């Protein structure tokens, strides 16, 4: 009889092993066997919990997305109600420590690539994209006319993704300060009174 709570402990252990495997070997080098080896368990147990490699990647991305959404909630809770502060909080969440470790960044890159081919991952990516846009649009709408708010939200979402992508591909530590400064300067520019 399995121990109470063992399922969640085992799943977390396997997700961590997946993140490490993608970090060290890339998605193509990550197999159920390589994850099992890193977790020091049998391949059969990995199959039992996730079915196949796609199921494992989906569960890993759901974990990373939950971390992102939790970071967004944390940063927004700490911000004032002013749109500028709330927008900066959403930006900060996207560059939160939970999102910029090498294993997580490499997993995001693998996820983006696979989401073009795998419907389940595409749906997850769509949910994430819509959530970011919705959060940004809601805050911009407090300070800008509707059409400008939508345009500003699209622009800031693209900037966040672009800064994150460049940082992930830079090959060194992620420069959070520089990314935050660029994104926050863009927010200031968008919210500046027009002449």
From Swiss-Prot:
GO terms for molecular function: DNA-binding transcription factor activity; transcription cis-regulatory region binding. Gene3D superfamilies: Tetracycline Repressor, domain 2. Residues 31-50 bind DNA. It comes from the Bacteria. Residues 8-68 form the HTH tetR-type domain. Keywords: DNA-binding, Repressor, Transcription, Transcription regulation. Pathway: Amine and polyamine biosynthesis; betaine biosynthesis via choline pathway [regulation]. It holds the Pfam family TetR_N. One of its GO terms (biological process) is glycine betaine biosynthetic process from choline. Repressor involved in the biosynthesis of the osmoprotectant glycine betaine. It represses transcription of the choline transporter BetT and the genes of BetAB involved in the synthesis of glycine betaine. This is HTH-type transcriptional regulator BetI.
